């Protein structure tokens, strides 16, 4: 399935919802669980900052547990030309319409995940992955290629099964990988 996404800020979890999110069945809380093999999410703008998929929760900041924006299930996930960000501890700046920006929820950095991926052969091209602690960009895929992507995070953030080709990596901590014995490479 191909999903084309027009420039805008799309909240996967309502940032104005004051309810504290809790996980189910022993898992962390998720913004959206997606079960769809060969899902392609494609931003309709070459600048990934102009198509934003966002959340605004983290551990103890709107959630009990490490809030994760997406939980993808299926082989062949592809994301392209967009930003996937958990803006719990990072300001969201949207260049096309400033009023869609949002100040970070809290300056105290907490676990705020972007996405888990249960499957194989995942691919990201020209995507900005933004969060801080435990960013987890498509974490869990058996194999994933990040091509020309941008990563912003602190510790325990990069997936151990990813290959990062021509990516820019901005680390604000000392240990970007949570695990590195699974075949990942930069």
What are these regions (language model features)?
Residues 1-186:
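Sequence-level preference for short, compositionally simple segments enriched
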């Amino acid at each position: 399935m191909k999903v084309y996404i027009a420039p805008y800020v799309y909240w996967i979890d309502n940032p104005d919802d004051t309810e504290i999110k809790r996980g189910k069945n022993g898992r962390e809380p998720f913004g959206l669980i997606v079960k769809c093999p060969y899902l392609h999410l494609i931003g309709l703008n070459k600048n990934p900052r102009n198509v934003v998929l966002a959340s605004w929760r983290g551990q103890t900041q709107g959630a009990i547990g490490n809030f994760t924006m997406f939980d993808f299930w299926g082989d062949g996930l592809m994301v392209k030309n967009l930003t996937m960000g958990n803006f719990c501890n990072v300001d969201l700046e949207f260049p096309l319409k400033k009023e869609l920006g949002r100040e970070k929820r809290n300056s105290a950095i907490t676990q705020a995940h972007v996405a888990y991926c249960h499957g194989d052969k995942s691919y990201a091209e020209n995507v900005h992955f933004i969060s801080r602690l435990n960013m987890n960009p498509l974490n869990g895929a058996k194999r994933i290629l990040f091509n020309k992507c941008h990563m912003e995070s602190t510790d325990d953030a990069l997936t151990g099964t990813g290959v990062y080709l021509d990516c820019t990596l901005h680390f604000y901590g000392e240990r970007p990988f949570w695990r590195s014995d699974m075949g990942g490479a930069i």
